[in-house]
């Protein structure tokens, strides 16, 4: 099913969220005018408002993941470089910030998000004409990249969040990439690679869990999630068009995330096998907050199609990630 064009605003004039999946983008993610039954008090919103800005970069040699996260009462950020040939993370940092001081999250996917804590810095911004820039600096790690323009529509998904209120996300498929990633004395060109981004903004439950998969080339890509957001953000980009997908099923071994995964949707439009090359994992327990997270990096093979009667498109060794994540935030 091809998706309709995105509305101008996430909320109607009466404050009702425009739940659904759309092709395109909006200029603001603002929940202050939410009407009942989705509206909550300002104090509740302060502690349940979660936002993140994530960028993935993929080349035959490297996979890089970068994110800035604001959970309302604090913020954090991470960056890593994964060497696909050595099958290991060769540089990374993860840094908790100071509330209200170290992170600034964009109000939409076309805005600028920044994190700065001592020598660790991340900047994600749109520099005009649908072009984006990423800069990362940290101990032994540096990324300077530009990517875009978007060759296929952005996904806009808005829906209820289990245990919370409303949530929305804006995601790209593969974008042309150029730049450089460096660690220590080693430098890698990113030219000719593929970038993608995820801007998410919502009022979520204190206990939130999800499984996620994402991979992109310049002519094919997908995003899948099972958990707090249901099938709202499940989408396929193919031949310049954006299609909605059904509920996603993740068959894997949680105790052995580097074993093969099988992922498929219940509408018969996607069936993929994921072969991990390595993973980034964190397990934090700060008493008032906790996060258990594993993000395998690897390749997807199988098939996708735009409709039940369309021919299957073969997917072979498409670089991307899966994720098993549970947060108390």
Kindly label every feature range from the protein language model:
Residues 1-329:
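Structured soluble/peripheral alpha/beta segments that form catalytic or ligand/cofactor-binding pockets
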């Amino acid at each position: 099913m091809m998706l309709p064009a995105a509305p101008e605003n996430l909320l109607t004039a009466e404050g009702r969220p425009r739940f659904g999946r759309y092709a395109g983008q909006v200029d603001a993610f603002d929940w202050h005018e939410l009407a009942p039954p989705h509206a909550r008090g300002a104090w509740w919103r302060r502690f349940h408002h979660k936002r993140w800005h994530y960028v993935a970069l993929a080349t035959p040699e490297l996979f890089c993941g970068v994110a800035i996260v604001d959970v309302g009462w604090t913020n954090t950020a991470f960056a890593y470089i994964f060497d696909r040939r050595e099958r290991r993370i060769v540089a990374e940092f993860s840094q908790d910030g100071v509330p209200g001081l170290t992170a600034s999250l964009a109000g939409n996917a076309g805005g600028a998000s920044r994190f700065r804590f001592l020598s660790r810095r991340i900047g994600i911004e749109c520099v005009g004409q649908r072009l984006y820039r990423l800069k990362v600096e940290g101990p032994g790690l540096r990324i300077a990249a530009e990517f875009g323009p978007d060759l296929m529509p952005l996904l806009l998904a808005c829906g209820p969040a289990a245990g919370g209120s409303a949530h929305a996300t804006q995601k790209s498929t593969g974008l042309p990439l150029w730049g450089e990633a460096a660690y220590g004395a080693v430098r890698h060109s990113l030219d000719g690679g593929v970038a993608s981004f995820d801007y998410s903004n919502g009022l979520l439950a204190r206990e939130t869990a999800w499984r996620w998969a994402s991979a992109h080339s310049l002519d094919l890509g997908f995003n899948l999630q099972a958990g707090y957001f249901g099938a709202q953000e499940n989408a396929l980009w193919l031949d310049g068009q954006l299609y909605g997908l059904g509920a996603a099923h993740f068959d894997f071994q949680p105790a052995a995330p580097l074993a093969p995964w099988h992922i498929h949707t219940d509408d018969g439009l996607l069936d993929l096998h994921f072969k991990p090359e390595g993973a980034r994992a964190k397990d934090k327990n700060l008493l008032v907050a906790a996060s258990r997270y594993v993000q395998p990096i690897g390749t997807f093979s199988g098939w996708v199609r735009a409709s039940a009667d369309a021919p299957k498109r073969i997917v072979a060794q498409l670089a991307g990630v899966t994720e098993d994540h549970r947060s108390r935030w």
